[in-house]
Amino acid sequence: TAKACKADAVKFQKRTISVLAAERPNIYQNPHPNPWNAFGPTYEKHREALEFSIAQHRELKEYCETYGIEYSCSVWDLQAAIEIALLNPAWIKIPSASNLCLDMYDWLADNFAGNFHISLGMTTEKEEYDIVDYLKKKGLWSRVVLYNCTSGYPVDFKDVFLKNIAHLGGY
């Protein structure tokens, strides 16, 4: 368990599958890319089988708090962000696949007092700059942690660019 490993925090994920399936039918209506890992005939059914309900997230947060471990969650869409923000975690993570969702930043800026951890995988340099500029203009910059990441699992060593961390420090 996280407690036995002396973890300070755990991070879960929350998606609103129906929203993402409507936005990305080419992904969600097809079979899981690794059929032996699939929990359903389509990626949508696979994700639905794995997704925790908001009640389960509430229970996970309470369990974490019982053991002095910080609960957090990656939110993949606005509805998921709203649901998780209402649990009041110290921070919410925005995954690479959702880091350009400005409506999510807008809602969180007005309704969530915690910090934002934002993965910058899958972004161009211009998109990265636009995200930073937008967050600064919204007055959120003091609450932001940027993650240098490469969206690949596993990542080939040739694609790892750790020098980019210094670049992010320049913001």
What are these regions (language model features)?
Residues 1-171:
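Catalytic cores and adjacent flexible loops of soluble metabolic enzymes
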